[in-house]
Amino acid sequence: MNNFNNEIKLILQQYLEKFEAHYERVLQDDQYIEALETLMDDYSEFILNPIYEQQFNAWRDVEEKAQLIKSLQYITAQCVKQVEVIRARRLLDGQASTTGYFDNIEHCIDEEFGQCSITSNDKLLLVGSGAYPMTLIQVAKETGASVIGIDIDPQAVDLGRRIVNVLAPNEDITITDQKVSELKDIKDVTHIIFSSTIPLKYSILEELYDLTNENVVVAMRFGDGIKAIFNYPSQETAEDKWQCVNKHMRPQQIFDIALYKKAAIKVGITDV
């Protein structure tokens, strides 16, 4: 067992060092983006490998494990952010690129809400829309719904707006740096998606309880277990506020989805 522990620890340390090095390079020169995208794709395959998942779960050094997870969560979130920025710039310059990691995310959108599907009469809020807001664009184009994206990064907001102007100029899409408490039409929001790389997503969810209507549905992207090295994990919620009505565990996808409704709304899993 110690050999397995040492192996998984070594692999994760190597990934951490690679991500840190690639991130510094790509900040200096966009040409290194392909190497970072390749690393992200390889990392995704590693996470979805059942053998490594077993080794990760068997690793019992809690403190050492937790520290590595925290470091990997942070650096991979920064890498995703930077890749989105460069992809946005390239698209605006007339170039296009794709990676397995981003394909994985974009192909997951149809699964977000199960039977609580989005229609043209709905309004979606995406918390953490990023510089390359394909979720917003895909939802708006496929459903006709009104969509709002919020992000605390001014660069992401600027690039996101420009991407929307190019790819979906006729859709009802708003991107802003406002906080959830500052959104004037927050009561009209019917569906909410949280990006998986937001560390404070459960604090924002708690804040949303008093701001939103009684029937709002929340899709929380998360990663537990080995998936936590590329996502922030799920957390318990106050039983009298948000009720997790379904956890959609997806062995072949890089993150899973937890569906929440307000505790006052009694909904069974079969209704989701």
From Swiss-Prot:
Inducing stimuli: Up-regulated in metal-poor media.
Record flagged with keyword Cell cycle: no
EC number: 2.5.1.152
Inactivation phenotype: Cells lacking this gene produce neither staphylopine nor the biosynthetic intermediate 2-amino-4-{[1-carboxy-2-(1H-imidazol-4-yl)ethyl]amino}butanoate. They also show a decrease in the intracellular content of nickel, copper, cobalt, iron, and zinc.
Transmembrane residue ranges: none
GO molecular function: nicotianamine synthase activity
Domain of life: Bacteria
Catalytic reactions of this protein: D-histidine + S-adenosyl-L-methionine = (2S)-2-amino-4-{[(1R)-1-carboxy-2-(1H-imidazol-4-yl)ethyl]amino}butanoate + S-methyl-5'-thioadenosine + H(+)
Function: Catalyzes the nucleophilic attack of one alpha-aminobutanoate moiety from SAM onto D-histidine to produce the intermediate (2S)-2-amino-4-{[(1R)-1-carboxy-2-(1H-imidazol-4-yl)ethyl]amino}butanoate. Functions in the biosynthesis of the metallophore staphylopine, which is involved in the acquisition of nickel, cobalt, zinc, copper, and iron, and thus enables bacterial growth inside the host, where metal access is limited. Therefore, this enzyme probably contributes to staphylococcal virulence. Appears to be specific for D-histidine as substrate.
Family: Belongs to the methyltransferase superfamily. CntL family.
Protein name (Swiss-Prot/TrEMBL): D-histidine 2-aminobutanoyltransferase
Gene: cntL
